[in-house]
Amino acid sequence: MVKKKAKFRHISINKKKFYFYEIKWFDILGDSGHASSKEFDAMKPALMTTTGYVYSKDKKYLWTFASYDDETFSDRNCFPIGCIKEMKKVEI
């Protein structure tokens, strides 16, 4: 039996492929008000989900975008790698 190669959602801009990902990441939670020890202990960062195309990634950062045309990118983000919990390439 021949195993089919997974096909992942992507786009091409100027002959470069950009793959579409679902990214789960921790968002910092802040509060400037007064709180008890119990309330303070209950603080947890929010687990967020972002979908978009990965522009670039290195040891420190992940850059994404969600909108584009033939030459420019919009809806851009830059995530510190330490905040990212999980990245999944989206299949077609």
Language-model segments: what does each one mean?
Residues 2-92:
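Conserved RNA-binding domains used in RNP assembly and mRNA/RNA metabolism
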